[in-house]
Swiss-Prot record:
Residues 707-822 form the SET domain. Residues 846-856 have a biased composition (Basic residues). CDD domains: SANT, SET_EZH. It is an enzyme of class 2 (transferase). Residues 1-11, 68-87, 393-419 have a biased composition (Polar residues). S-adenosyl-L-methionine binds at residue 821. Residues 594-693 form the CXC domain. Its EC number is 2.1.1.356. PROSITE patterns: CXC, SAM_MT43_EZ, SET. This is Histone-lysine N-methyltransferase EZA1. It catalyses: L-lysyl(27)-[histone H3] + 3 S-adenosyl-L-methionine = N(6),N(6),N(6)-trimethyl-L-lysyl(27)-[histone H3] + 3 S-adenosyl-L-homocysteine + 3 H(+).
Length: 856
């Protein structure tokens, strides 16, 4: 009995648990239905309120526009009430006269008789219809086709010429499949899905309830919920990242700060978001950097009041400097002095001991005592500092220097720039001066034995002083006028500031002025950069025989022997020792390229893609695999065997096949060719000086030296291109620009162009075709002719293939331009076919074949 009772009690308990679960599920479903009804009423109420708010806002806008007219109408009604009749309404009801036409000779008179006039018909002269014209966008350079402009896999539509009927032209195998319309959820529906999903989850019961409420499939609801969940996650991450402070970005390095800009910047066109090469390009770092821009320190002027060159102002020692130690306590009003000459000078002057000063290299500079800044003339020479025998010689020496304008006791920082802390530290005593002087002399002797340049010890921490003369002393001493606290060097350098500094050294060398002005503007001063450069002993990138910018005498920076020295550039090549290259006119390009050009074969050009080889190109180099030459945009070294080395042509020789560039179908590059140069002025604005009498004649496309082209009605077919000014034979007329599309895309577009009896397709290379139908320039309207006066030629310009139009003969002004479209035997229209007797073989013509049938 006990067992039976226990079993029965267990069954009763299980039934009770099942009943509780069922009640909870029912309560949950009932709560879900109530929640859905509540959300529905809430969203509907919000929608009604938003509609009312929009309606009220629109009503106010309408009132603002209508109020002037309403006030004018009310004023007119007031005038009618006062007895003034409405003349407009009265004239409409009772006109003065009714006219059916004008009599001869009375068209200009105001009053016309009321009798009817019989109108005469006028026959207009017959005017010929203008040719059909399609809208197009002007391009001054080629562009890659946008992804959404492709016709592959899309239904193409064209208009029949005669009837104007709209027809569909698509391949049967590429008929677009009908896409199911995707459900667009409203803002209210998104709110319901998101809130219910967050509160109740996305179980089957919840999905069924949402399906009944929104009349949407469960799969669409689940997909939409996942999209909303992903958006919420992204918004949360963006919100957490948006709360940064201003200083956090400075804690990142330059590479992290420019991470998003590296791929957006085109290093071939020097623009962001390049439409020719794409906005996301692989970053290729050249193995050899360009030499930094250099100038001598003696040729520069201080860039600001915080410039380190201010510390190099001339310091002339007055008579009171020698007796400063003994009279400092008596003259409390005398200004404190920092040290300007060697610590041996004041001690020797006070004791009357003769002192031999070492010979140093100084520059001949003109001194302006009013400003305290050296006016440097750039005249450099070596002068011997005279022997100082007594302290009384100092004033006489100072007067002599003013007459000769050449400072013999002038101090110059030879290998480093002292910090302001050292220059301002002027109150230190002369304790230990003798020891310091001994150490300095020993270091000078050691430097002589090693062969290093002797550092100028006239300014250091504990043994020299700069003296401020008495007012009205007349000694003409030059000092630094302002040593403000703001000019003190900053000790903290953020990572991005350090990276910017290193990049500045790479570009400008050890030029603190240019680094601070161009890369650290607002972050560091010129003096900060100079002190950081000295304290950290940063070695200059790409050391060579280039003189150190901090050395006044043009000596090279010591310690360069162990560094890797890259090949010297043309700028720093020694005179009389020009580097000789194994070079011939037929070995500049790749052998296969030269054979193809020399053989006159009309083969397609190869698309160039820069290689990322680190040093020398091997068998796996993309350029070698693609049978193209390495260019200046590649990462390989300049000594690469596959590198195109340009030409060495003399003046006016680059327009013949003797020029390697011209023979290879290339334009000369001023960065590669030896004697080809580009100048934009006379040098007054700091541009590169001229290197010869005339510019190279094989850079027309690069410099955009095109002729003026006019658009007009052609006598042959449709529209035509006309020349404004007369040109000689082989003159460059302009560039044929358009969209860069693939060959597969060109085949699909060509079917539409064939039906419309027009084509603007031009084969460019093995990967791209130019299409000027939608985008291009006015040369797209140049028509085909069996006897053309122009010819098209594909040229390789700055790493890209471009189509140039050149004069085949002398062309007079206002003459229409024609060139051969290179039609096939049965492709040319009737008007464009050659006469039967003309069977001239023109297979050796160097310009490429265009996919054209007729230009309108």
């Amino acid at each position: 009995m006990v067992t039976d009772d226990s079993n029965s009690s267990g069954r009763i308990k299980s039934h009770v648990d099942d009943d509780d679960d069922g009640e909870e599920e029912e309560d949950r479903l009932e709560g879900l239905e109530n929640r859905l009804s509540e959300l529905k009423r809430k969203i509907q109420g919000e929608r009604v309120r938003s509609i009312k708010e929009k309606f009220e806002a629109n009503r106010k806008k309408v009132d603002a526009h209508v109020s002037p007219f309403s006030s004018a109408a009310s004023s007119r009604a007031t005038a009618e009430d006062n007895g003034n009749s409405n003349m407009l309404s009265s004239r409409m009801r009772m006109p003065l006269c009714k006219l059916n036409g004008f009599s001869h000779g009375v068209g200009d008179r105001d009053y016309v008789p009321t009798k009817d006039v019989i109108s005469a018909s006028v026959k207009l002269p017959i005017a010929e219809r203008i040719p059909p014209y399609t809208t197009w966008i002007f391009l001054d350079r080629n562009q890659r086709m946008a992804e959404d402009q492709s016709v592959v896999g899309r239904r193409q539509i064209y208009y029949e010429q005669h009837g104007g009927e709209t027809l569909i032209c698509s391949d049967s195998e590429e008929e677009p499949e009908p896409e199911e319309e995707k459900r667009e959820f409203s803002e209210g529906e998104d709110s319901i899905i998101w809130l219910i999903g967050q509160e109740y989850g996305m179980g089957e019961e919840v999905q069924d309830a949402l399906c009944q409420l929104l009349s949407v499939d469960a799969s669409d609801i689940l997909e939409r919920y996942n999209e909303l969940k992903l958006k919420d996650k992204q918004n949360t991450e963006e919100f957490s990242n948006s709360g940064f402070k201003l200083g956090i970005s400075l804690e990142k390095g330059l590479g992290a700060a420019l991470d998003s800009f590296d791929n957006l910047f085109c290093r071939r066109c020097l623009v962001f978001d390049c439409r020719l090469h794409g906005c996301s390009q692989p970053l290729i770092s050249a193995s050899e950097k360009q030499p930094y821009w250099s100038d001598y320190e003696g040729d520069r002027k201080p860039c600001s009041k915080h410039c380190y060159l201010q510390l190099k102002a001339v310091r002339e020692v007055p008579e009171t400097c020698s007796n400063f130690a003994s009279k400092a306590e008596e003259k409390a009003s005398e200004e404190e002095c920092s040290k300007a000459v060697s610590s041996d000078v004041p001690h020797a002057a006070a004791s009357g001991v003769s002192l031999q000063v070492e010979k140093t290299d100084i520059g001949i500079k003109n001194v302006d005592s009013s400003s305290g800044v050296e006016q440097e003339h750039g005249i450099r020479g070596k002068r011997e500092v005279p022997i100082l025998k007594d302290s009384n010689d100092l004033p006489n020496l100072s007067n002599k220097k003013q007459k000769t304008a050449a400072s013999d006791t002038k101090m110059s920082f030879v290998n480093s720039v002292p910090s302001l802390d050292q220059a301002l530290d002027s109150t230190k005593g002369d304790q230990g001066g003798t020891t310091d002087n001994k150490v300095n002399r020993d270091s000078e002797a050691d430097a002589k034995e090693v062969g290093e340049p002797i550092p100028d010890n006239s300014v250091h921490d504990g043994g020299s002083s700069i003296c401020q003369p008495h007012h009205g002393s007349g000694n003409g001493a030059i000092i630094i006028a302002e040593m403000s606290e703001t000019s003190r060097p900053s000790t903290e350098w953020n990572p991005i500031e350090k990276d910017l500094y290193l990049k500045g050294v790479e570009i400008f060398g050890r030029n603190s002025c240019l680094i601070a002005r161009n890369l650290l503007s607002g972050l560091k001063t010129c003096l900060d950069v100079s002190n950081y450069m000295r304290e950290n002993e940063v070695s200059v990138f790409r050391r060579s025989s280039t003189p150190n910018l901090l050395l006044d005498d043009g000596r090279t920076d010591p310690g360069n022997d162990n560094d890797e020295v890259p090949p010297r550039t043309r700028l720093f090549r020694r005179k009389g020792k020009t580097r000789k290259l194994k070079y011939s006119t037929k070995s500049a390009g790749h052998p296969s390229v030269w054979k193809r050009i020399a053989g006159g074969k009309n083969q397609s050009c190869k698309q160039y893609t820069p290689c990322g080889c680190l040093s020398m190109c091997g068998k796996d180099c993309p350029c070698l695999t693609n049978e193209t030459c390495c260019e200046k945009y590649c990462g390989c070294s300049k000594s690469c065997k596959n590198r195109f080395r340009g030409c060495h042509c003399a003046k006016s020789q680059c327009r013949s096949r003797q020029c390697p560039c011209f023979a290879a179908g290339r334009e000369c590059d001023p960065d590669v060719c030896r004697n080809c140069w580009v100048s934009c002025g006379d040098g007054s604005l700091g541009e590169a000086p001229r290197r010869g009498e005339g510019q190279c004649g094989n850079m027309r496309l690069l410099l955009r030296q095109q002729q003026r082209i006019l658009l007009g009605k052609s006598d042959v077919a449709g529209w035509g291109a006309f020349l404004k000014n007369s040109v000689s034979k082989n003159e460059y007329l302009g560039e044929y620009t358009g969209e860069l599309i693939s060959h597969h895309e060109a085949d699909k577009r060509g079917k539409i162009y064939d039906r419309a009896n027009s084509s603007f397709l031009f084969d460019l290379n093995d990967q791209y075709v130019l299409d000027a139908q939608r985008k291009g320039d006015k040369l797209k309207f140049a028509n085909h002719s069996a006897k053309p006066n122009c010819y098209a030629k594909v040229m390789f310009v700055a790493g890209d293939h471009r189509v140039g139009i050149f004069a085949n003969e002398r062309i007079e002004a206002s003459e229409e331009l024609f060139y051969d479209y290179r039609y096939g035997p049965d492709q040319a229209p009737v008007w464009a076919r050659k006469p039967e007797g003309s069977k001239k073989d023109d297979s050796a013509i160097t310009h490429r074949r265009a996919r054209k049938h007729q230009s309108h």
